[in-house]
A protein has these predicted regions:
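Glycine-rich, basic loop-to-helix element that forms the pyrophosphate-binding segment
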Residues: 36, 79-95
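Non-catalytic, C-terminal membrane-associated alpha-helical segments of glycosyltransferases
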Residues: 237-243, 254-317
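Short, flexible, basic/aromatic active-site loop/helix in glycosyltransferases
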Residues: 132, 147-166
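Short, well-formed alpha-helical segments that are part of the catalytic scaffolds
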Residues: 28-42
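Short aromatic/hydrophobic "clamp" motif used to bind/position activated sugar donors
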Residues: 100
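Conserved donor NDP-sugar-binding/catalytic core segment of glycosyltransferases
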Residues: 112-145
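A conserved acidic beta->alpha catalytic loop
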Residues: 39, 46, 54-63, 107
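Acidic donor-binding loop at a coil-to-helix junction in glycosyltransferase catalytic cores
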Residues: 168, 192-203
């Protein structure tokens, strides 16, 4: 993984703001990726880089991004479908700025997104991770739901015990490159496209706290989420969330020991009882969420773990 001064696309920001590059991972969402990329460029500093890591099955997404990619700030990298965490690691390795922001290919950042992220990092070199709000676009609440996460006020966690106060999700997330390097990047056995299906964002924040970095939430940074799920699809989505989070919590216990018990109890109960869906009439049954969480926790407890890096070991082929 590169040092902060490693070669890559140049990046600078207006006076008073830290240099920030953006990584967008995408797979088989040509229209969404184009919308996200255009919104990112509209919200980005003139000298920020945007790296799109495309794990699509064909060239449709790259063709949709052809006009966007004519902007000298944009690079599109075709990559094998190894999952979201791997895509984000590749994207970070392909940038140079000391801060890297992420959103998803079904999201669009609001104006001022990067300025808000820069402000959240400014003046405190101990902050390693920043999360913002993920606001659902308008949708038919009778037909399904769109996952969302609203930050109502600034919060900072500096210890594992405070992790339940800053949940955050990776659709509006930024990291300090030095933290990414220190942690060995995102755990590629977690997240969308992996066997454990989710949790790479939560896991990164947990490991950052264990390494002594702070995790901050800011309501000033936000993205709009267009990822509507019909109820049947939503059940599978939430099941995936629970499996990933179960694995993350099991890993937390293995890495931190008894110090992890309190935050595990708080976070697990919050997600199992509430989950990311606010419509009580259609929420997947608590038993389904609990079963998925426990399945993920059992897998995470038994999976080979590289304790030095804090990553699950890749399965043997």
């Amino acid at each position: 993984m590169p040092d902060e001064g490693a070669a890559g696309p140049p990046s600078s920001a207006p006076a008073g703001g830290g240099a920030i590059d953006v990584v967008l991972a995408t797979r088989n969402r040509a229209r969404g990726a184009e919308r996200a990329a255009r919104a990112i460029l509209a919200a980005a500093y003139p000298s920020s880089s945007l790296v799109v890591v495309d794990q699509s099955d064909d060239s449709t997404t790259r063709e949709a991004l052809r006009e966007v990619a004519s902007d000298p700030r944009v690079s599109v990298i075709a990559a094998p479908p190894r999952g979201l965490a791997a895509a984000r690691n590749l994207g970070v390795a392909s940038t140079a700025a000391p801060i890297v922001a992420f959103t998803d290919d079904d999201c669009a950042p609001a104006p001022g997104w990067l300025e808000a992220i820069a402000a959240a990092f400014a003046g405190d070199a101990s902050i390693g991770v920043v999360f913002g709000s993920v606001v659902a676009a308008d949708y038919d609440r009778g037909a399904g739901f769109t996952p969302a996460y609203r930050v109502d006020r600034p919060r900072t966690a500096r210890t594992l015990a405070r992790k339940p106060s800053v949940e955050g999700i990776g659709a509006c997330m930024a990291i300090r490159r030095s933290t990414w390097r220190a942690l060995g990047g995102f755990d590629e056995q977690l997240g969308a496209g992996s066997a454990l299906r989710a949790g790479e964002d939560t896991d990164f924040a947990v490991r950052a706290l264990l390494a002594g970095a702070g995790v901050r939430e800011t309501p000033a940074a936000s993205v709009t989420h267009y990822g509507f799920r019909a109820w049947d699809e939503g059940r599978a989505t939430i099941e995936g969330y629970m499996i990933g989070l179960g694995a993350v919590h099991a890993k937390m216990l293995r890495l931190a020991g008894p110090a992890a018990l309190r935050p595990i109890a708080a976070l697990a109960w919050r997600w199992i009882a509430r989950g990311p869906v606010v419509d009580l009439n259609h929420r997947p049954p608590r038993a389904l969420r609990l079963a998925a969480f426990l399945r993920g926790a059992w897998t995470g407890w038994r999976a080979p773990l590289d304790r030095e890096r804090g990553h699950f070991a890749a399965p043997r082929r």
